[in-house]
């Protein structure tokens, strides 16, 4: 499976027992959705490798205690601690309305109620406190704050994000 076909679920945080169990930090608001997985993809040497789960249980909120098949010792567990965990995109719960996954809107046109379509979303910058749509308008990159108050509609059918942006926000880039 390719990384582009998957979503990041979390990271193997540490060993849990001498029998090879590990704790996976789940980077999600709903860890209970992932308590009974049969398998996950573990990133190892820049490749996604399937690991099958023998047993798992939630542990202290955001952690999943896991025993993988063929990981039977502390040494086996040491070899995978720190690795990222992925699942296929098909396992993401479907969102409706104006809720969306970041990867879902990449490539969507972005439209302002006043200006009309002004570019395509090329990526999302979530490295700061306020996530931003990175929008390409010809050769010009426009940064648009992802603020619920500005968001009018996610039009999945027409692949558009419709916003009501403050006057001057887009124009200052053009």
Curated annotation (Swiss-Prot):
GO terms for molecular function: ribosome binding. Keywords: Chaperone, Cytoplasm, Ribosome biogenesis, rRNA processing. One of its GO terms (cellular component) is ribosome. Coiled coil: none annotated. It is found in: Cytoplasm. Binds ribosomal protein uS19. Belongs to the RimM family. This is Ribosome maturation factor RimM. It comes from Flavobacterium johnsoniae (strain ATCC 17061 / DSM 2064 / JCM 8514 / BCRC 14874 / CCUG 350202 / NBRC 14942 / NCIMB 11054 / UW101) (Cytophaga johnsonae).
